[in-house]
Amino acid sequence: MSTARPCAGLRAAVAAGMGLSDGPASSGRGCRLLRPPEPAPALPGARLLRLPESEPVEAASPERSGWTEALRAAVAELRAGAVVAVPTDTLYGLACSASSSAALSCVYRLKGRSEAKPLAVCLGRVADVYRYCQVRVPRELLEDLFPGPVTLVMERSEELNKDLNPFTRLVGIRIPDHAFMLDLAQMFGGPLALTSANLSSQASSLSVEEFQDLWPHLSLVIDGGPIGDSQSPECRLGSTVVDLSVPGKFGIIRPGCALENTTSILQQKYGLLPSQGSCS
């Protein structure tokens, strides 16, 4: 397991008074920000890097340079055991190496999250799911839903850190439909633990400004611009969480932002049956 830095500036009051939620819904790759990456030390603790307005295409462009800078900075912090704030296809999240037990503990402390609540695992490719999970559905099903605003819960493999959600044999997998997160997960090369960027019991975040109270306790904040409409409650629903651990069935753990499309694919295309008690 990797060695983690202590959470920057963690205070006892923060550890005592925070809580969590896993949040909003929005469109896929559309993180928008107006300026190229630059450090902005508005608060002590976190370095802020702003992504280009759109995913860079030209290899030699300033946008590509800024995109690469942000990726390298995030990977370096994650490999050092730090906690990084990142944009996804649904909301802003907190990411750390799932292989670093100290970093996992740091995430729980700074959010004030109960350690009885699981963290999701973010991966960069469908092929990676087979390394970290016991997959009992067709690969085509995974490819229909990933990347996208869903969390698929399956039985975990022995490859995952035993300190990650030690109270359950299951793990939720995310492959966000967000260009930066896909690049980050692939460049990092291992499982990332992912949860929403907010204090426990508070609303999930659609912009970096909405979780500024966490900045002093983070090493890096990646600003991808606003995600969705902050005035719309639907934009804070978070990913749709589906239990696929029982062969031939599915269970909706959280309806989230993609319920209708997800259940349609599972039932109509793959013939899965909703499990008893599922809210589908």
Swiss-Prot record:
Source organism, top-level taxon: Eukaryota
EC number: 2.7.7.87
Domain YrdC-like residue range list: 68-258
Catalysed reaction equations from the record: L-threonine + hydrogencarbonate + ATP = L-threonylcarbamoyladenylate + diphosphate + H2O
Expression triggers: By ischemia/reperfusion and endotoxemia.
Transit peptide: 1-56
Modified residues (Phosphoserine): S61
Sample GO molecular function, one term: double-stranded RNA binding
Protein topology in the membrane: Peripheral membrane protein
Tissue expression pattern: Widely expressed. Expressed at higher level in testis, secretory, and endocrine organs.
Broad EC category: transferase
Subcellular location: Cytoplasm; Mitochondrion; Cell membrane
Keyword terms, alphabetized: Cell membrane, Cytoplasm, Membrane, Mitochondrion, Phosphoprotein, Transferase, Transit peptide
A GO biological-process term: tRNA threonylcarbamoyladenosine modification
Cellular component, GO annotation: cytoplasm; membrane; mitochondrion; plasma membrane
Comment block on domains: The mitochondrial targeting sequence (MTS) is weak and only mediates import of a small fraction of YRDC in mitochondria.
PANTHER family: SUA5 (PTHR17490), THREONYLCARBAMOYL-AMP SYNTHASE (PTHR17490:SF10)
Similarity section: Belongs to the SUA5 family.
Free-text function comment from the UniProt entry: Cytoplasmic and mitochondrial threonylcarbamoyl-AMP synthase required for the formation of a threonylcarbamoyl group on adenosine at position 37 (t(6)A37) in tRNAs that read codons beginning with adenine. Catalyzes the conversion of L-threonine, HCO(3)(-)/CO(2) and ATP to give threonylcarbamoyl-AMP (TC-AMP) as the acyladenylate intermediate, with the release of diphosphate. Participates in t(6)A37 formation in cytoplasmic and mitochondrial tRNAs. May regulate the activity of some transporters.
Subunit structure: Interacts with RSC1A1.
Protein's name in the database: Threonylcarbamoyl-AMP synthase
UniProt organism field: Mus musculus
Encoding gene per record: Yrdc
